[in-house]
Amino acid sequence: MRRAIGVTVLAVVGLLLLPYLLTPLYRTGHPVSTLMIWRKLSGASMSRQWIDFAAMSPALPRSVVASEDAKFCSHHGIDWDSLRDVLDDAEDGEVKRGGSTITQQVAKNLFLWPGRSVIRKALEFPLAMWIDAVLPKQRILEIYLNIAEWGPDGQFGVEAGSRYAFGRSATGLTAREAALMAAILPNPVRRSARKPGPGVRRLAGTYMVRARAAELRSCWRDDRGS
């Protein structure tokens, strides 16, 4: 009995430590998300074509950071101010967009599971801070842009999402198209950049303005210009 308990404890500890051991290896390569793996194993449709950060339209990272995590370049994996605002809103009975940073979403997508869970959040916080400490900001953003879900039929990453929405590579997206891509990120199954509704178009306009703002910090190389 004790042996079985010991083996179980070791297995649990090993599973908890595995993401921390794998993270340094993700400085290179083309990592996949747990959701991508699940869809592949379950036989559901799934498409992802990796695109290097340098090949993406310069408007994409700016639009996504402007929409998802404006303090991405200054926090260390967790935006504590945004988190406090979310908790205050929840206490007041207001339901708004979550306060997860891009780094938290990378932690969740790479190693954890979707859905709301206190246990998942407890695992996500230290893992996000570890990812921020181990990987460069540009690499974190590159991974996020390549593993986020971007379409209703298993389109993962900006390349698959761009080809689905606009019929061409993410390399040549305009600022408007990049903003439309950013606007559907909370729910790419119900929102569409291909046939954007009034709400998506309105959000895209807002994100275009934010992406051009001088105060939006950049912590990645932009060799192509914008």
Swiss-Prot record:
Pathway: Cell wall biogenesis; peptidoglycan biosynthesis. GO terms for biological process: cell wall organization; peptidoglycan biosynthetic process; regulation of cell shape. The keyword Cell wall biogenesis/degradation applies. GO terms for cellular component: peptidoglycan-based cell wall; plasma membrane. It is a single-pass membrane protein. Its EC number is 2.4.99.28. Signal peptide: none annotated. It is found in: Cell inner membrane. It catalyses: [GlcNAc-(1->4)-Mur2Ac(oyl-L-Ala-gamma-D-Glu-L-Lys-D-Ala-D-Ala)](n)-di-trans,octa-cis-undecaprenyl diphosphate + beta-D-GlcNAc-(1->4)-Mur2Ac(oyl-L-Ala-gamma-D-Glu-L-Lys-D-Ala-D-Ala)-di-trans,octa-cis-undecaprenyl diphosphate = [GlcNAc-(1->4)-Mur2Ac(oyl-L-Ala-gamma-D-Glu-L-Lys-D-Ala-D-Ala)](n+1)-di-trans,octa-cis-undecaprenyl diphosphate + di-trans,octa-cis-undecaprenyl diphosphate + H(+). The chain crosses the membrane at residues 5-25. Keywords: Cell inner membrane, Cell membrane, Cell shape, Cell wall biogenesis/degradation, Glycosyltransferase, Membrane, Peptidoglycan synthesis, Transferase, Transmembrane, Transmembrane helix. One of its GO terms (molecular function) is pentosyltransferase activity. InterPro entries: Glyco_trans_51 (IPR001264), Lysozyme-like_dom_sf (IPR023346), PBP_transglycosylase (IPR036950), Pep_trsgly (IPR011812). It comes from the Bacteria. PANTHER family: BIOSYNTHETIC PEPTIDOGLYCAN TRANSGLYCOSYLASE (PTHR30400:SF0), MONOFUNCTIONAL BIOSYNTHETIC PEPTIDOGLYCAN TRANSGLYCOSYLASE (PTHR30400). NCBIfam families: mono_pep_trsgly. Peptidoglycan polymerase that catalyzes glycan chain elongation from lipid-linked precursors. Belongs to the glycosyltransferase 51 family. This is Biosynthetic peptidoglycan transglycosylase. The gene is mtgA.
